[in-house]
């Protein structure tokens, strides 16, 4: 037993299981660390005005940041298996503080690429979705879907909810001051996790929440993290479920992070919607995303996850197609933001849960890391492609229509998916 066990409440003496404390710690760190992904997007114009760099020069590192965020997930899966959540959060926080400090003080383009492009993508990338998978898998038997929902919502909410505040701070005191929002918030959440966070319930003399029998601690992996990640991919690639989840989650990335997060503001500008209003629409999506994802986690514990995903993708596809053809007013966009926000990343809990059900509580999160990589690679392609399409055609309509149709294809694909067999823990 860990030496920290004495400092923690023994079994049966606390009404609140420490699993919920871990969810709270991971939620706070995920929200503030991923805010570093979203906040720079609303600072492009003031940075361009101060530094004299073009929008294109400032946008390219934004796409790199998003791609790195997704691409480092598979290796992060192996690292998380080998070293545990606490050490990985320690590494992530150090990278994040370095990236934000470099971004706040930058005057040269190499600082833009290294700080905003590389470090601010890598830092949340090594923990964000892995905490969403690993904490529920290790700490929960009961309410696992709800825990996944809470943590899954943190990622999208963090990237969106601080955008209006950052835009306002930038107008008042400059873009460098706006970057203090993720700096202060993530710094505090980082230190709190290092103080109170633990890798497993067994480290403090507990069993996972809802466990009816003692859950043994798996033997520590002896392979390096690259081998662990490749082994997870090898295990996943043998199953049809893996390819279906990777394909549909890539469509999730195309229709969320790759489209609306990056292009909703200029889409609104094409429709005559002021910048301030469109920035608040992203915040509304972020707030209702959290509600929708937590609700999705609750539903995952009660209903067939395959059919939940079919409904989620179907509603998202219809919403995107509607947005193209509707006579969109500010009120219409607000209604879209609420409805779309509820569905923005509601796909995460059932996707994670199906991964853990199929591949087990240890390997499942590492397999999901590869699925998540597909999500963000596709998002990065869409982010770039939608911008090029807009420049060539003068409209975002083809991009939004394509995303909507792909969502409907994803919805239909789950009707043919077999119920996964439960993998051993």
Specify the residue positions occupied by each region the protein language model found.
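C-terminal transmembrane helical hairpin of 12-TM major facilitator-type secondary transporters
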Residues: 257, 277, 283-289, 295, ...
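Extracytoplasmic
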Residues: 18-55, 73-76, 163, 259-265
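Helix-to-loop junctions at the C-terminal end of transmembrane segments
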Residues: 72-85, 293-304, 390-391
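Extracytoplasmic gate region of multi-pass secondary transporters
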Residues: 40-44, 234-293, 382
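Hydrophobic core of transmembrane alpha-helices in multi-pass small-molecule transporters
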Residues: 31, 111-126, 250, 332-346
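Cytoplasmic helix-loop-helix junction between adjacent transmembrane helices
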Residues: 116-153
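Helix-loop-helix hairpin linking two adjacent transmembrane segments in secondary transporters
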Residues: 151-202
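C-terminal ends and interior cores of transmembrane alpha-helices
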Residues: 94-107, 315-327
């Amino acid at each position: 037993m860990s030496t920290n066990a004495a400092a923690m409440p023994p079994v049966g003496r606390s009404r609140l299981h420490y699993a919920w404390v871990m969810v709270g710690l991971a939620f706070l760190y995920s929200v503030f660390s991923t805010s570093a992904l979203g906040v720079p997007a609303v600072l492009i114009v003031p940075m361009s005005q101060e530094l004299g760099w073009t929008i294109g020069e400032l946008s390219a590192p934004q796409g790199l940041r998003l791609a790195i965020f997704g691409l480092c997930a598979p290796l992060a899966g192996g690292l998380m298996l080998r070293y545990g959540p606490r050490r990985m959060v320690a590494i992530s926080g150090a990278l994040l503080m370095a990236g934000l400090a470099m971004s706040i003080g930058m005057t040269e383009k190499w600082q833009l690429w290294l700080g905003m492009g590389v470090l601010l993508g890598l830092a949340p990338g090594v923990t964000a979705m892995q905490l969403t998978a690993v904490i529920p898998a290790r700490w929960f038997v009961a309410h696992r879907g709800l825990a996944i929902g809470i943590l899954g919502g943190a990622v999208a909410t963090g990237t969106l909810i601080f955008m209006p505040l950052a835009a306002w701070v930038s107008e008042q005191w400059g873009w460098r001051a706006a970057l203090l929002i993720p700096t202060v918030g993530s710094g505090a959440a980082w230190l709190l996790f290092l103080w109170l966070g633990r890798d497993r319930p067994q480290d403090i003399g507990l069993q996972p929440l809802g466990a009816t029998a003692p859950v043994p601690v798996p033997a520590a992996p002896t392979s390096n993290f690259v081998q662990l990640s490749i082994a997870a991919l090898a295990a996943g690639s043998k199953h049809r479920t893996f390819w279906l989840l990777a394909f549909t989650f890539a469509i999730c990335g195309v229709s969320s992070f790759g489209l609306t997060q990056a292009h909703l503001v200029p889409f609104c500008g094409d429709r005559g919607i002021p910048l301030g209003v469109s920035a608040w629409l992203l915040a509304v999506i972020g707030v209702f995303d959290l509600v929708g994802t937590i609700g999705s986690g609750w539903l995952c514990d009660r209903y067939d996850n395959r059919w939940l995903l079919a409904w989620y993708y179907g509603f998202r596809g219809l919403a995107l197609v509607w947005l193209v053809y509707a006579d969109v007013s500010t009120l219409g966009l607000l209604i879209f933001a609420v409805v779309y926000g509820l569905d923005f990343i509601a796909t995460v809990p059932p996707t994670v849960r199906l991964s853990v059900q199929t591949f087990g509580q240890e390997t499942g999160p590492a397999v999901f890391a590869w699925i998540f990589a597909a999500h963000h690679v596709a998002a990065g392609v869409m982010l770039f492609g939608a911008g090029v399409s807009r420049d060539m055609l003068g409209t975002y309509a083809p991009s939004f229509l394509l995303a909507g149709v792909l969502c409907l294809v994803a919805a239909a694909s789950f009707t043919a998916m077999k119920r996964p067999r439960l993998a051993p823990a």
